[in-house]
Design a protein with these regions (language model features):
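Multi-pass alpha-helical transmembrane bundles in non-GPCR membrane proteins
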Residues: 1-217
Length: 217
């Protein structure tokens, strides 16, 4: 399962740079959970932020497990954890804007996670397409005044635009890492590891975005 990633596979951890860089998600996830600057009490984001932090922890641990063991189960968890982030972004957007009741949002998140998990299991080669299908709608929603209550020129929404820019750069580096021209298998500086780090930064910027665009009950 590690054939599409540049870094050389050795003993445990199988891919050192990619394994260690996964802890960027753990670091920022713990930051979200313990931050004293969480969205204010009485806002929907105050309830949503811990779920974001837990999802980031899930991504970090799953990614480490995959790159350390290079097992098919680890690969499944790694991709599935990213699916849950995309789903949280989508259902979280509808919930925090009051377009979807909390209970329905949670039920939709769980049901969609099961469905896409089964799709990933049945069609593993479609994992990148499925990830894009899940991630893009949530990003689009968070870019609109329909969800945030603020126009694109508002200073309140800078974090989601910054997160999108970081994610685009990270994705570009991820693609380059799969090219023989940019692949140095024995190097500790791996494009996939940079993808992990920038992806964690982008996820943390979602937390800042929640904090800057709160919705009171």
């Amino acid at each position: 399962p590690g054939h599409c990633i540049c870094e050389h596979a050795g003993e445990f951890p199988g891919q050192l740079a990619n394994s260690v860089s996964s802890f960027a998600f753990v670091f920022f996830g713990v930051w979200v959970l313990l931050s004293r600057r969480n969205p204010a009490s009485g806002t929907r984001e105050h309830r949503l932020a811990p779920l974001l932090g837990i999802t980031m922890l899930f991504i970090g641990v799953s990614s480490f497990f995959y790159h350390a063991t290079l097992s098919f189960f680890g690969q499944f968890l790694d991709i599935f954890s990213m699916f849950t982030f995309g789903l949280l972004l989508f259902f979280g957007a509808l919930y925090r804007a009051g377009r979807l009741h909390g209970g329905y949002a949670l039920a939709g998140f769980v049901a969609a996670s099961v469905v896409f998990g089964l799709l990933q299991f049945a069609y593993p080669d479609a994992r990148r397409i499925l990830f894009a299908v899940l991630l893009v709608p949530g990003i689009i929603l968070e870019l609109t005044p329909f969800i945030t209550g603020h126009g694109p020129r508002s200073r309140r929404v800078w974090a989601i635009y910054a997160g999108l820019a970081v994610m685009v750069v990270a994705y570009g580096i991820w693609l380059l890492d799969q090219s023989p021209v940019f692949c140095e298998r024995g190097s500790l500086l791996q494009g996939h590891a940079i993808w992990h780090t920038l992806g964690a930064v982008a996820a943390f910027l979602v937390f800042i975005h929640y904090r800057l665009t709160p919705h009171h009950d």
